[in-house]
């Protein structure tokens, strides 16, 4: 019998079990050579979290052109503030891989980032957080350009998952998936200032424009919880589909997509009306992370249960292609891309 944490990190291990559970020292980045960002994205980078590898996909031919070994359990990724280096969080490898975001070339590692399941810079780029999903800890680093210095390691149970920030970079929010809570951290003091209960197994987080509401994907249920975080209360639930998980904004400051891992759908939400506007259906199982081309017309999606990546035509809300990749594909990235707003 798998533990819940194993199922969460690698949900395709036992899909039937997952369905049952759901329903009932300073660090310095390596110097990166400057490669101009193309006018259009050329290569999609996909993390195969159960294979310790990265698939590089030619976005024109939609074929895997290279599979590169990386550290154990690569789950999430993000750009450095100067946009020259892609950071890949190798959770079980206890390090962060450095990669050229344009061509997928490996550039080295940052060691001793312990259990980095999810990572993220604050909007002002002065703070960097690594969530230790397995070890129940949140590590907060002071960031000065490419330099990181551990400010504080906070024990935070149970199972810190995703991250969001206020636009002024004063507060970070962390979902605690196994205690079904949302935690707020004051970044100046690196202290937990409050917790509040959420629905079962919260995961993805997204802050609406103007820092008005915090959207929480309730993966153990079928909805997005809308939180008035200033008053620590629920405003409403937006019902989307079972396994409501992660967010990707369209880039128009109005709409955000949400992946529903168990329902195998993606919902389009209006952040102004707090209503669902539609669903993308007919998808392979386990839609998870998403990325959008800079013209806002095409979305790439990882399907964790199906070992595939999908390409979706946004105007028609239809799946137009799938590409086989490795086991448990999670993070996906390319540059340039639509704005995260």
Which stretches of residues belong to each language-model region?
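Bacterial N-terminal signal peptides that target proteins for export
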Residues: 2-17
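Accessible peptide chain termini
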Residues: 1-2, 152
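Predominantly soluble domains enriched in secretory-pathway, periplasmic, or organellar proteins
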Residues: 22, 26-341
């Amino acid at each position: 019998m798998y533990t819940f944490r194993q199922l969460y990190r690698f949900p395709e291990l036992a899909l039937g079990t997952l369905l049952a559970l759901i329903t009932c020292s300073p660090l310095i980045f390596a110097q990166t050579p400057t490669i101009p960002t193309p006018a259009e994205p050329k290569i999609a980078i996909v993390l195969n979290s159960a294979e310790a590898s990265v698939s590089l996909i030619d976005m024109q031919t939609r074929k895997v052109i290279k599979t590169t070994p990386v550290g154990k359990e690569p789950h999430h990724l993000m750009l450095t503030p100067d946009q020259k280096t892609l950071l890949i969080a190798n959770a079980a490898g206890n390090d962060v891989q450095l990669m050229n975001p344009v061509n997928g070339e490996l550039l080295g590692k940052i060691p001793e980032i312990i259990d980095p399941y999810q990572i993220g810079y604050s909007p002002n780029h002065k703070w960097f957080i690594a969530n230790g999903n397995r070890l129940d800890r949140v590590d907060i680093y002071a960031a000065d350009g490419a330099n990181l210095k551990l400010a504080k390691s906070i024990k935070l149970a149970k199972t810190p998952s995703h991250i969001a920030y206020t636009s002024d970079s004063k507060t970070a929010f962390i979902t605690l998936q196994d205690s079904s809570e949302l935690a707020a951290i004051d970044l100046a003091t690196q202290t937990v200032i409050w917790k509040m209960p959420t629905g079962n197994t919260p995961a993805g987080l997204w802050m609406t424009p103007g820092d008005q509401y915090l959207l929480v994907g309730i993966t153990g249920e079928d909805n997005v919880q809308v939180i008035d975080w200033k008053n620590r209360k629920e405003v409403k639930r937006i019902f989307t589909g079972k396994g409501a998980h992660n967010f990707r904004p369209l880039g128009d400051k109005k709409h955000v997509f949400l992946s529903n891992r168990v329902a195998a759908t993606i919902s389009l939400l209006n952040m102004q009306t707090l209503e669902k506007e539609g669903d993308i259906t007919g998808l392979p199982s386990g839609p998870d992370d998403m990325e959008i081309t800079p013209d806002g017309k095409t979305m790439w999606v990882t399907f964790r249960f199906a070992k595939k990546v999908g390409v979706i035509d946004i105007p028609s809300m239809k799946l137009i292609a799938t590409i086989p990749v490795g086991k448990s594909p999670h993070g996906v990235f390319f540059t340039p891309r639509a704005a995260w707003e």
